């Protein structure tokens, strides 16, 4: 049965077609917002996957290049692996959806979103987010939805609901908020130092808009939604928990997890698990789920310790940060390096500077963004958690963590005019026990400062956690969560910022949303903690950016020329610019607007190249003194080169004060001589003189 629904959303029409396409999917919706079209589907396997202790949810966001009238690049001329934007969008969709599936559901579920056309006024990422929630809501897949998402931009202090792509790219706020009918369930933000109060206001304006979308989804579900199918529960039987408590009492489990040493805790749990394995040796069903059962036993113990007893596993107070350490310049010869340690989480960040020709090229659906100047890459090797496995390159988690730390620093980076460099920061995880992305933010900030990047302000990040009870008022917010509190808690609320405001937020949640008091307390806690980190730790390692770039970094000078003179600098088939490069050893980049960047390791060579470019692009003025090289000798005079492609002639009568019969009597090829420009002769040609050069020139 085909039905079409529509609603007005932020001044544009959102249209949803159900039953028109993809009838074999569990749920499908074809959405059009303006002229942006996205096909969203939800499918689930018939049976649970054996031998797993997690919910196997996959989310895909497919960018089809035909959506913007492009043919993909490369030899294959078809879409390849997912872009960074696709991965980040899929993660944003995953985070609010995952908590709304049953906790004991183990069937494979795939949410697929295919972008089929793009209207620059309506961002496809937002449409896909709404589409995934709707397709799942009307399907027969067990799901405690719907949820809805809204994006908020800001320009000149005014909020923009669901901004256009241009408004999103150029605004001061990039906020995405997902909500259920009662609570906020996901927050993702990048911001130009937005004050905490303004950010909270924006979050709850999104929450209000979400309620209209949820009402729209509920109407569709009531009319054509499928009944939810029955499924095989993978819940641990209560009698198994009772037997486990007989073998290891809650007090013994509490003693096992109550330590600030991650390795000690893991060894304690390993020994406890061995006891259970011996006791349940003849019960194959219980052995099959023992790992999940031990996890849940630990979880109940830790949550009770925190919520009821106000005891954290490592003995810290609720608002206490782990021991901190920071240092810079630990790696020689690189352009900038720093290490930041928080408890058993340790990040080493290394910054590399390069000319602007090294910026990352982006071929995506957003035609406003074709390059990326600042790149932050995050690596998470297995040794950082004491494990052994081969490295297969960055996964979605690594890409997500790198993007978060990147987003945190972008607002404080200098402009291209102020600092004409491409910048790459790489965060290497040396040790991990929670919140490595926030440690990466702190380390990369210090590394940029050590490299001489003139960032406007210092940035730090911290994460807060949460443990909730049976009611909305029964909760405890934790500052600086470690791994165990992340695993067994309900929230990972990451916030980065300066002293003056927030630059990034990422909220991961395991429950059905947060009340406003929790959101406000978490944001307030993170501000207090990040200010402490900057003032008491980071600023003592490096208080401000170095005045000059590192000695091993390339030096870059930038000048601006008349765009009409670009051809003179380049020369026929690149002859002139290649000659400048060959003579000086520098690298030259020229934009269409006439911005010329000259990059090299030798300041003298850079200055020489810039002088050449200035000579090439500047008309000679009467009285101007120049140095030229004799490149040709004729009977009537000598030709001098002042820069590649820029020559002038000195008549034989202007070479020496006394009369000479032959130019060769005074000049030879390759001689460097000073000349003065005499202006134009009767024929309109520029003439030069050697003999009229002032003695003090």
Feature names for model-found ranges:
Residues 290, 552-558, 563-697:
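Single-stranded RNA-binding regions, centering on S1/OB-family and related RNA-binding modules
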Residues 103-109, 144-146, 213-231, 283-290, ...:
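Flexible, glycine/charged-enriched surface loops at secondary-structure junctions
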Residues 1-45, 49, 53, 232-369, ...:
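Extended amphipathic alpha-helical scaffolds
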Residues 25-110, 115-117, 122, 188, ...:
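Glycine-rich, flexible beta-strand/loop modules in the N-terminal catalytic cores of phosphate-handling
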Residues 1-232:
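Long, basic N-terminal domains or extensions that often function
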Residues 140-260, 448-547:
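Mobile "lid/hinge" segments at catalytic clefts and subdomain interfaces of large enzymes
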Residues 27-29, 37, 122-141, 327-351, ...:
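Conserved phosphate/anionic-ligand binding catalytic regions in large, soluble enzymes, centered on
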Residues 113, 185-190, 231-235, 244-256, ...:
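Short, hydrophobic beta-strand segments
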């Amino acid at each position: 049965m085909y039905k079409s629904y529509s609603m007005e959303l932020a001044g544009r029409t959102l249209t949803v077609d159900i039953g028109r396409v993809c009838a074999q999917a569990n749920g499908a919706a074809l959405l059009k917002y303006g002229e942006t079209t996205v096909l969203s589907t939800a499918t689930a396997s018939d049976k649970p996957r054996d031998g797993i202790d997690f919910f196997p949810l996959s989310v895909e966001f497919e960018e089809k290049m035909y959506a913007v009238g492009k043919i993909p690049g490369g030899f294959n001329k078809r879409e390849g692996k997912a872009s960074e934007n696709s991965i980040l969008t899929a993660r944003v969709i995953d985070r609010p959806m995952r908590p709304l599936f049953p906790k004991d559901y183990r069937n494979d579920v795939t949410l697929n979103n295919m972008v089929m056309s793009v209207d620059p006024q309506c961002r496809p990422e937002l449409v896909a987010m709404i589409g995934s929630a709707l397709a799942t809501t009307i399907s027969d897949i067990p799901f405690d939805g719907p949820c809805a998402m809204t994006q908020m931009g800001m320009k000149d202090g005014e909020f923009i609901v669901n901004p256009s792509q241009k408004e999103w790219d150029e605004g001061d706020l990039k906020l995405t908020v997902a909500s259920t009918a009662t609570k906020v369930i996901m927050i993702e933000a990048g911001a130009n130092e937005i004050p905490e109060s303004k950010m909270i206001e924006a979050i709850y304006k999104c929450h209000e808009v979400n309620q209209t979308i949820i009402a729209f989804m509920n109407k569709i579900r009531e009319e054509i939604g499928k009944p939810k199918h029955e499924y095989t529960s993978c819940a641990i039987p209560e009698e198994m928990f009772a037997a486990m408590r007989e073998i290891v009492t809650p007090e013994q489990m509490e003693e096992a997890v109550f330590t600030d040493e991650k390795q000690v805790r893991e060894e304690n749990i390993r020994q406890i698990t061995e006891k259970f394995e011996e006791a349940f040796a003849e019960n194959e069903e219980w052995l099959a789920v023992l790992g999940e059962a031990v996890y849940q036993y630990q979880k109940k113990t830790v949550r009770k310790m925190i919520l009821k007893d106000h005891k954290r596993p490592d003995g810290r107070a609720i608002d206490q940060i782990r021991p901190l350490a920071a240092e810079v310049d630990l790696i020689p010869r690189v352009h900038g390096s720093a290490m930041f340690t928080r408890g058993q989480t340790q990040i080493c960040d290394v910054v590399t500077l390069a000319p602007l020709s090294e910026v990352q090229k982006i071929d995506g659906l957003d035609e406003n963004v074709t390059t990326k100047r600042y790149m932050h890459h995050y690596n998470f090797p297995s040794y950082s958690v004491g494990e052994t496995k081969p490295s297969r390159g960055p996964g979605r988690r690594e890409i997500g963590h790198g993007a978060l730390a990147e987003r945190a620093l972008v607002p404080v980076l200098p402009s291209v005019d102020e600092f004409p460099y491409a910048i790459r920061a790489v965060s290497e995880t040396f040790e991990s026990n929670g919140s490595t992305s926030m440690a990466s933010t702190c380390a990369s900030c210090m590394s940029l400062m050590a490299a001489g990047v003139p960032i406007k302000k210092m940035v730090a990040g911290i994460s807060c956690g949460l443990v909730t009870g049976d009611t909305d008022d029964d909760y405890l917010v934790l500052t600086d969560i470690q791994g165990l509190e992340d695993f067994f808690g309900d929230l990972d609320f990451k916030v980065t910022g300066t002293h003056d405001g927030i630059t990034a937020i990422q909220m991961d949640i395991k429950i059905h949303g947060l009340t406003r008091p929790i959101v406000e307390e978490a944001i307030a806690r993170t501000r207090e903690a990040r200010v402490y980190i900057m003032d008491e730790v980071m600023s003592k390692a490096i208080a401000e950016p170095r005045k000059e770039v590192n000695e091993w970094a390339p030096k870059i000078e930038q000048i601006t020329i008349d765009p009409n003179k670009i051809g003179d600098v380049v020369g026929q088939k690149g002859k002139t610019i290649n000659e400048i490069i060959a003579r000086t050893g520098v690298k030259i980049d020229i934009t269409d607007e006439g911005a010329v960047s000259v990059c090299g390791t030798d300041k003298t060579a850079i200055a020489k190249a810039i002088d050449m470019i200035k000579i090439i692009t500047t008309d000679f003025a009467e009285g101007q003194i120049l140095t030229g090289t004799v490149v040709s000798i004729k009977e009537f005079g000598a030709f001098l080169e002042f820069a590649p492609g820029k020559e002038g002639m000195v008549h034989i009568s202007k070479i020496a004060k006394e009369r000479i019969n032959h130019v060769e009597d005074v000049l030879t090829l390759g001689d460097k001589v000073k000349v003065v420009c005499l202006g134009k002769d009767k024929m309109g040609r520029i003439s030069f003189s050697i003999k009229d050069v002032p003695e003090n020139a």
